[in-house]
């Protein structure tokens, strides 16, 4: 395993640990999710170029598109939550309320 792959796997695991540790605020959770998606994108692009897999060469771009959609929905949820409640606590996102 090269040092670049190891660094990207470490970045992914640190972002995952950030999601698990800083889950009280929505903004920090969204930033950690973006870090996870970015490290997955770079790792996937490097692995595809290293192994010359042309059949799945569009997969990193598709992952990047889904990451952008996730960021847009997350920011819309953040704006809606902060205008309704005045803060960005995840505990305000109770899906059982009607």
From Swiss-Prot:
EC code: 7.1.1.2
Any one GO MF annotation of this record: NADH dehydrogenase (ubiquinone) activity
Gene Ontology BP annotations: ATP synthesis coupled electron transport
UniProt keyword terms in alphabetical order: Electron transport, Membrane, Mitochondrion, Mitochondrion inner membrane, NAD, Respiratory chain, Translocase, Transmembrane, Transmembrane helix, Transport, Ubiquinone
Record membrane topology: Multi-pass membrane protein
InterPro entries, sorted: NADH_UbQ_OxRdtase_chain4L/K, NUOK/Mnh_C1-like
Matching Pfam families: Oxidored_q2
Record-level GO cellular component terms: mitochondrial inner membrane; respiratory chain complex I
Gene3D superfamilies according to UniProt: 1.10.287.3510
Enzymatic class: translocase
Transmembrane spans: 1-21, 28-48, 59-79
Location relative to the cell: Mitochondrion inner membrane
Catalytic activity, reaction form: a ubiquinone + NADH + 5 H(+)(in) = a ubiquinol + NAD(+) + 4 H(+)(out)
Primary role: Core subunit of the mitochondrial membrane respiratory chain NADH dehydrogenase (Complex I) which catalyzes electron transfer from NADH through the respiratory chain, using ubiquinone as an electron acceptor. Part of the enzyme membrane arm which is embedded in the lipid bilayer and involved in proton translocation.
Summary of subunit composition and partner proteins: Core subunit of respiratory chain NADH dehydrogenase (Complex I) which is composed of 45 different subunits.
Family: Belongs to the complex I subunit 4L family.
Name of the protein in its database record: NADH-ubiquinone oxidoreductase chain 4L
Gene: MT-ND4L
């Amino acid at each position: 395993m090269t040092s670049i792959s190891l660094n990207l796997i470490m970045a992914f695991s640190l972002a995952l640990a950030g999601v698990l540790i800083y889950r009280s605020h929505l903004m920090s959770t969204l930033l950690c999710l973006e870090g996870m998606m970015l490290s997955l994108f770079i790792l996937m692009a490097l692995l595809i170029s290293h192994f010359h897999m042309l059949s799945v060469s569009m997969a990193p771009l598709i992952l990047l598109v889904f990451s952008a959609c996730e960021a847009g929905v997350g920011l819309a949820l953040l704006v809606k939550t902060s205008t309704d409640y005045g803060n960005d606590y995840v505990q305000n996102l109770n899906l059982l309320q009607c």
